[in-house]
Structures are given as structure tokens and as C-alpha cells.
Regions:
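Positively charged n-region of N-terminal signal peptides that target proteins for export
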Residues: 1-4
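Bacterial N-terminal signal peptides
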Residues: 9-20
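Short N-terminal segments immediately surrounding and downstream of signal-peptide cleavage
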Residues: 24-46
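Acidic/histidine-rich, surface-exposed loop or edge segments in extracytoplasmic proteins
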Residues: 26-33, 96-110
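Short, contiguous alpha-helical
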Residues: 38, 42-49, 61-105, 146-189
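Well-ordered alpha-helical scaffold segments within catalytic/enzyme domains
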Residues: 47, 51-52, 90, 127, ...
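Surface-exposed helix-capping loop/turn segments at secondary-structure junctions
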Residues: 53-62, 132-141, 178-184
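Acidic/histidine-rich alpha-helical segments that form the ligand environment
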Residues: 109-145, 154-167
Length: 189
């Protein structure tokens, strides 16, 4: 019985210490919704952009071909698509039209070189950061028009698209890189 009580007392003291630490950390690190959402964009940007930079320009037209891959986007098309969605979602959050050509989620046909594609991508992340910076506790859950379908959504819901959509395509791009003998930068030691 004494051992059981000692274990419970130790456990209680440990939990109390951990919860106090967590509370003081939470108070010191309290962030706004906008800051949290911006952190998500920074995370995907920090992996996506280096992956886009890692592929040599002569491989930007690469798409898997062994198996049933008809209609799969090339490496360059993956990047332009993510950038276009960043602009589309950012514009919806801001309540405006995209400031650049998004070409039905494909990105502009005129953007072809690696340098131009990377510029389009990086500027789309700047626009995404600008969009989430306008999100406040007051407008976070306010119903707004969404660019995908006819229903209403929220700025919070749309802001999550930057991360999950970017990482969805990052996963595909990581495979493309590896199929070309390139270790994605985020996987390097």
C-alpha cells in the first residue's frame, strides 16, 4: 500500500510540475490565430520552395511514366498549381480577385522557365502571408464565399488549405525528386 501511495504521490507531483510548466509556456507564447496560421504557411513554404529549387531545370518537365500515370502533372505543373491555389485562396480570404493569372488552378502558360516558376511560387507565398495577416479573432469564423463550389466557408477553413494542399503536392514532388536520384532537401542530414 505504501508503494502505491508513493507512486501516486510521485505521479501527482510530476503531473503538477508538468502542468505548471505548460501553463507558464502557454502564457508566454500566446499567439493570435493569424500568427498560428502564418506559422503553418512558413512550415510548408520552408519545405516546398527548397524542393522546387532542388530539381534541375532540365527535369522540370518530368512526370512518372511507368504504370498508369496518364494526365499526371509534371514537376513544373505541380509547382505552378500550388502557387495558383495559394493566390486563389489568398484572394478569397482578402475578398478580392487573384492579383495574377491563375489559369484555372494551373498557373499562367507564359511562366515556363525554372526561374520564372520559382518567382511565381515565392510571390504566391508572400501573398498567402499577406492574406492570413488579415485574419482576426473577429473575422476568423465569419462566413465568406469560397472559390471551390457554391457554399460558404470561413477564413480559418480557407487558411488551412495553404498547409494541407501544399504538403499534398510536396509529397508528390518528393517522389519525383527521388525518381530522379535527388534526395529532397528536407530529408537530407
Amino acid at each position: 500500500m505504501k508503494k502505491t501511495i508513493a507512486v501516486f504521490v510521485s505521479l501527482f507531483v510530476s503531473l503538477l510540475a508538468m502542468s505548471s510548466f505548460g501553463v507558464s509556456q502557454a502564457v508566454a507564447e500566446k499567439k493570435t490565430a493569424s500568427q498560428v496560421l502564418d506559422g503553418g504557411i512558413k512550415t510548408v513554404e520552408g519545405e516546398f520552395v527548397p524542393a522546387a529549387e532542388a530539381m534541375p531545370e532540365d527535369k522540370y518537365d518530368f512526370a512518372p511514366s511507368n504504370g498508369d500515370f496518364k494526365g499526371v502533372r509534371t514537376f513544373a505543373q505541380q509547382i505552378k498549381h500550388v502557387a495558383a491555389i495559394n493566390y486563389i485562396v489568398g484572394a478569397a480570404i482578402l475578398g478580392e480577385k487573384p492579383p495574377v493569372d491563375v489559369n484555372e488552378e494551373k498557373g499562367p502558360d507564359s511562366v515556363k522557365s525554372k526561374a520564372d516558376i520559382l518567382k511565381y511560387l515565392k510571390e504566391s507565398f508572400v501573398y498567402a502571408h499577406k492574406a492570413v495577416a488579415t485574419i482576426t479573432e473577429a473575422n476568423l469564423l465569419e462566413p465568406i464565399a469560397v472559390p471551390f463550389g457554391k457554399e460558404k466557408g470561413t477564413r480559418l477553413g480557407l487558411a488551412t488549405v495553404f498547409a494541407w494542399h501544399g504538403f499534398d503536392h510536396y509529397g508528390q514532388m518528393a517522389v519525383y525528386l527521388r525518381m530522379n536520384g535527388i534526395v529532397p532537401p528536407a530529408s537530407r542530414n
